[in-house]
């Protein structure tokens, strides 16, 4: 059976996260699978590179599925874009080898978090808020300490997979773009709510509410769950997946 890869963009505001849920709860996976099953006249199960939380967006989610249908992947993509809600878009599709798996074949995931200093009715859908000025240089310093392999259990919610809490971060840093603070991070894997925990802790340190050494010390792990207030979901984007 053909193995088809879809690249997916979505505005996560109105969805209860990526992962399919029971009892009619609206999720991104559930919406795409329902439309695909209608188009292909068979039950479709998507594998995804990342399972984003409620309210988190994606610019570069990757999924794959197998189908018995003879339809070309480009026609499937066109039909999806006609039938899916406007908050979900499939910008590209391709046939991939049988052993390609959106999650397990991924080498690296990249996320970006966008934050503004004050609340905004216009930008708030796609940004978080620092609620005042922050020590930007300090946050840049803290982000450099994230690189390497660390135990991120104190920056994340309980692990659902039982695969441990060690993650290897290749790059992490802050930059400014047109008045918006942007945090970028790339790692081999991410724990549940990990990026929001990392950003929330850095914003707290930038406001002087959390000691920087305490923040860096939490990279040693220790269990007990998230020790920081996570940044709001609206500013977070799954940006790219590298294979």
Curated annotation (Swiss-Prot):
Matching Pfam families: PseudoU_synth_1 (PF01416)
Keyword line: Isomerase, tRNA processing
Gene3D superfamilies in the record: Pseudouridine synthase I, catalytic domain, C-terminal subdomain, Pseudouridine synthase I, catalytic domain, N-terminal subdomain
Catalytic machinery residues: 53 (nucleophile)
UniProt-listed InterPro entries: PsdUridine_synth_cat_dom_sf, PsdUridine_synth_TruA, PsdUridine_synth_TruA_a/b_dom, PsdUridine_synth_TruA_C, TruA/RsuA/RluB/E/F_N
Keyword tRNA processing attached: yes
GO biological processes: tRNA pseudouridine synthesis
Enzyme class: isomerase
Catalytic reaction list: uridine(38/39/40) in tRNA = pseudouridine(38/39/40) in tRNA
Function comment: Formation of pseudouridine at positions 38, 39 and 40 in the anticodon stem and loop of transfer RNAs.
NCBIfam families: hisT_truA
Summary of subunit composition and partner proteins: Homodimer.
Protein name: tRNA pseudouridine synthase A
Organism: Chlorobium phaeovibrioides (strain DSM 265 / 1930)
């Amino acid at each position: 059976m053909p193995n088809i890869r879809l690249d997916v963009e979505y505005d996560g505001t109105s969805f209860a996260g990526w992962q399919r849920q029971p009892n009619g709860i609206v999720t991104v996976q559930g919406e795409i699978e329902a439309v695909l099953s209608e188009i292909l006249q068979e039950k479709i199960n998507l594998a995804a590179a990342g399972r984003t939380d409620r309210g988190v967006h994606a610019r570069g989610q990757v999924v794959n599925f197998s189908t018995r249908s003879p339809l070309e992947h480009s026609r499937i993509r066109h039909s999806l874009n006609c039938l899916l809600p406007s908050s979900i878009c499939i910008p590209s599709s391709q046939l991939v080898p049988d052993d390609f798996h959106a999650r397990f074949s991924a080498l690296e995931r990249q996320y970006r978090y966008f934050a503004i200093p004050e609340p905004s009715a216009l930008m708030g859908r796609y940004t978080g808020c620092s609620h005042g000025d922050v020590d930007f240089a300090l946050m840049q310093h803290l982000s450099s300490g994230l690189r390497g392999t660390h135990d991120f259990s104190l920056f994340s919610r309980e692990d659902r997979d039982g695969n441990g809490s060690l993650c290897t971060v290749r790059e992490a840093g802050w930059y400014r773009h047109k008045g918006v603070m942007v945090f970028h991070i790339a790692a081999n894997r991410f724990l549940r709510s990990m990026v929001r925990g990392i950003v929330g802790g850095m914003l707290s340190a930038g406001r002087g509410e959390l000691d920087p050494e305490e923040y860096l010390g939490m990279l040693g792990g220790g269990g007990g769950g998230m020790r920081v207030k996570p940044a709001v979901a609206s500013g977070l984007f799954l940006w790219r997946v590298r294979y």
